[in-house]
Curated annotation (Swiss-Prot):
GO terms for molecular function: neurotransmitter transmembrane transporter activity; SNARE binding; syntaxin binding. Keywords: Cell membrane, Coiled coil, Exocytosis, Lipoprotein, Membrane, Methylation, Neurotransmitter transport, Prenylation, Sensory transduction, Synapse, Transport, Vision. PANTHER family: COMPLEXIN, COMPLEXIN-3. Residues 39-74 form a coiled coil. The modification Cysteine methyl ester is found at C155. Residues 13-47, 74-99 are annotated as: Disordered. It is a lipid-anchor. This is Complexin-3. GO terms for biological process: insulin secretion; modulation of chemical synaptic transmission; regulation of neurotransmitter secretion; regulation of synaptic vesicle fusion to presynaptic active zone membrane; synaptic vesicle exocytosis; visual perception. Residues 23-33, 74-87 have a biased composition (Basic and acidic residues). InterPro entries: Synaphin.
Length: 158
């Protein structure tokens, strides 16, 4: 209750005394901003420095993430022989040049590469055909080889 009375009456008293004081000089803007925050000037300056450092840190992390994404895009452009993008190259250079992909992204790329290599093989193509059973095909091939060996043993020319 006392807090509400103080805020309601206190604000009005400050307005009243401020207008009666006449030519009071409020000083520079930093000092009034520091006082408004309830800090001394030194504390306020330290706070501002800390804010600037945090912003620089966030910007650096953001630039790094952008460069990682650009590296990933350029990797896929190289892989699929697509034209290069200048903005991706500039983002990589802004981050310091040699940007490594995060482990998770590198792992995903490896898995994609393995899947594509598997699909590119003859067995991968056969496995993708519908209605084809590789087990029965293997059994038939082994039976055929067995028959050929038996017929070769019976042959007198060989």
């Amino acid at each position: 209750m006392a807090f509400m009375v103080k805020t309601m009456v206190g604000g009005q008293l400050k307005n009243l005394t401020g207008s009666l004081g006449g030519g009071e000089d409020k000083g520079d803007g930093d000092k009034s901003a520091a006082e408004a925050q309830g800090m001394s000037r030194e504390e306020y300056e330290e706070y501002q420095k800390q804010l600037v450092e945090e912003k620089m840190e966030r910007d650096a992390q953001f630039t790094q993430r952008k460069a990682e994404r650009a590296t990933l895009r350029s990797h896929f452009r190289d892989k699929y022989r697509l034209p290069k993008n200048e903005t991706d190259e500039s983002q990589i250079q802004m981050a310091g040049g040699d940007v490594e992909l995060p482990r998770e992204l590198a792992k995903m790329i490896e898995e994609d590469t393995e899947e594509e290599e598997e699909k590119a093989s003859v067995l991968g193509q056969l496995a993708s055909l519908p209605g084809l059973n590789l087990g029965s095909l293997k059994d038939k091939a082994q039976a055929t080889l067995g028959d050929l060996k038996q017929s070769a043993e019976k042959c007198h020319v060989m």
